[in-house]
From Swiss-Prot:
<dbReference type="GO" id="GO:0005634">
    <property type="term" value="C:nucleus"/>
</dbReference>
<dbReference type="GO" id="GO:0140223">
    <property type="term" value="F:general transcription initiation factor activity"/>
</dbReference>
<keyword id="KW-0677">Repeat</keyword>
<feature type="repeat" description="1">
    <location>
        <begin position="51"/>
        <end position="127"/>
    </location>
</feature>
<feature type="repeat" description="2">
    <location>
        <begin position="141"/>
        <end position="218"/>
    </location>
</feature>
<dbReference type="InterPro" id="IPR033710">
    <property type="entry name" value="TBP_eukaryotic"/>
</dbReference>
<feature type="compositionally biased region" description="Low complexity">
    <location>
        <begin position="17"/>
        <end position="34"/>
    </location>
</feature>
<dbReference type="GO" id="GO:0006383">
    <property type="term" value="P:transcription by RNA polymerase III"/>
</dbReference>
<dbReference type="Pfam" id="PF00352">
    <property type="entry name" value="TBP"/>
</dbReference>
<keyword id="KW-0539">Nucleus</keyword>
<comment type="function">
    <text>May be essential for embryonic development.</text>
</comment>
<dbReference type="GO" id="GO:0006367">
    <property type="term" value="P:transcription initiation at RNA polymerase II promoter"/>
</dbReference>
<dbReference type="GO" id="GO:0005700">
    <property type="term" value="C:polytene chromosome"/>
</dbReference>
<dbReference type="GO" id="GO:0001093">
    <property type="term" value="F:TFIIB-class transcription factor binding"/>
</dbReference>
<dbReference type="InterPro" id="IPR012295">
    <property type="entry name" value="TBP_dom_sf"/>
</dbReference>
<dbReference type="GO" id="GO:0003677">
    <property type="term" value="F:DNA binding"/>
</dbReference>
<dbReference type="GO" id="GO:0006352">
    <property type="term" value="P:DNA-templated transcription initiation"/>
</dbReference>
Length: 224
C-alpha cells in the first residue's frame, strides 16, 4: 500500500519527509500474520492521509492579566469557575487559543503545521498589542491528529487477540480498537470499516513511519 498526504497539505509542508523503515528497532515488526492474506491490494493503490487537527504550545514569557485580555478583545471568553484560562478564537487561520496567567498558550484547531505557526504568532501579537511585554518562545508541535481510509474491512477481534500487548478492544463501550504504537509513540483508533485515526504524532514523518509498520499488520487481518 502507498500513502500520501492530502495535496493541499503536502504542498505547504515544510519538511515534506518520506516514510522510512525502522523494522529492526520496532517491537511491532516481530508480530507476523498467522495466515497468508487472500486478497492483496495493488502496489500502486493510493491512500490519502488527511490532517484533522494540530495542537501547538508556546510561551509569551510574561504573566498575563486574563480579565483585562477578555474585556479588551473580541471572540474571547473567560469563566474562571469553569476553566482557568482565556479561550480566544481566530477566524483566519481558524484556530483557538487557551491562554493562561503564566504566559503559556495552547493553540488548537489548525488544519496543518503552517496554520498552527501563523495562528500562534497572531495570538502572541494580539497580546503584545494589549501592552504585555511579549516574547514568542518555546513554540512546539504537541499533537497531530490525522485520518486515513484503508478501504477494506478489518477483523478487530482477531487483531486484538494476536496484538493484545499493544491493543484494547471493548466494542460495547467504543466501536474502535485502540492500538498503542511503541515506535513511533502514536495511538491509533482502528475501525472495522478500515478507517484509522492517528493521535499523538509530533510530525508527518511519525505518521508515515507508523503506517509503514501497521499497514502490513492490518492487511493480514483483512476480512475476506
Amino acid at each position: 500500500m502507498q500513502f500520501h498526504f492530502k495535496v493541499a497539505d503536502a504542498e505547504r509542508d515544510r519538511d515534506n519527509v518520506a516514510a522510512t523503515s525502522n523494522a529492526a528497532a520496532n517491537p511491532h515488526a516481530a508480530l507476523q500474520p498467522q495466515q497468508p492474506v487472500a486478497l492483496v491490494e495493488p502496489k500502486d493503490a493510493q491512500h490519502e492521509i488527511r490532517l484533522q487537527n494540530i495542537v501547538a504550545t508556546f510561551s509569551v514569557n510574561c504573566e498575563l492579566d486574563l480579565k483585562a485580555i477578555n474585556s479588551r478583545t473580541r471572540n474571547s471568553e473567560y469563566s474562571p469557575k469553569r476553566f482557568r484560562g482565556v479561550i480566544m478564537r481566530m477566524h483566519s487561520p481558524r484556530c483557538t487559543a487557551l491562554i493562561f496567567r503564566t504566559g503559556k498558550v495552547i493553540c488548537t484547531g489548525a488544519r496543518n503545521e503552517i496554520e498552527a505557526d501563523i495562528g500562534s504568532r497572531k495570538f502572541a501579537r494580539i497580546l503584545q498589542k494589549l501592552g504585555f511585554p511579549v516574547k514568542f518562545m518555546e513554540y512546539k508541535l504537541q499533537n497531530i491528529v490525522a485520518t486515513v481510509d484503508l478501504r477494506f474491512p478489518i477483523r478487530l477481534e482477531n487483531l486484538n487477540h494476536v496484538h493484545g500487548q499493544f491493543s484494547s478492544y471493548e466494542p460495547e463501550m467504543f466501536p474502535g480498537l485502540i492500538y498503542r504504537m511503541v515506535k513511533p509513540r502514536i495511538v491509533l483508533l482502528i475501525f472495522v470499516n478500515g478507517k484509522v485515526v492517528f493521535t499523538g504524532a509530533k510530525s508527518r514523518k511519525d505518521i508515515m513511519d507508523c503506517l509503514e509498520a501497521i499497514s502490513p499488520i492490518l492487511l493480514s487481518f483483512r476480512k475476506t
